[in-house]
Amino acid sequence: MSKGEKVGKERRRYPRLQGLYLLSYINKERGVQKTGVSMARTINISPVGVGVEVYEAINRDSVMEMEIAVRDIVYAVQGKVIHSQEKSSGNYVIGIQFDQVQKELGKKL
C-alpha cells in the first residue's frame, strides 16, 4: 500500500490513513513518567488517533505526550493508549486515542 492509502473497508468518522511519520514520545502511567524521550514511527494516523510501532512494552491507559512530524510541521499532541500488541519481532504496536481532535493535522494528511 502506498502512503495515504486507506486501510481496509473504513467505517470510522475519521478514517485512518497509512503513513510513515516519525514521532517522539514520553510515556506516563498514573502521572509518573515511565520513560525518557523515546522515538517511534507511525503505522497509521487520523485526526483522532495514531497507530505506532515502539520497541518497548507500553501499558494500556498510559498517557502519551508526543510530537509528530508531518511534512514540514511538528504537532504536539497528547493521548491515551487504548491497545497494545506484541509483534513476533519483539516490537509492539500500540493504538493511541488523542485527547482532542487534531483538525489541523487532519488537513496535512
Model feature map: region roles:
Residues 1-45:
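N-terminal helix initiation/capping motif
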Residues 14, 53-57, 73:
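Short, surface-exposed secondary-structure edge patches
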Residues 24, 60, 92-109:
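Short solvent-exposed strand/turn elements
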Residues 26, 45, 84-85, 101:
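Residue-level recognition of beta-strand microenvironments
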Residues 26-61, 65, 95:
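Short strand-loop-strand
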Residues 42, 79-81:
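Conserved hydrophobic positions within beta-strands
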Residues 72-78:
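Short, Lys/Arg- and Gly-enriched loop/turn segments at beta-strand edges
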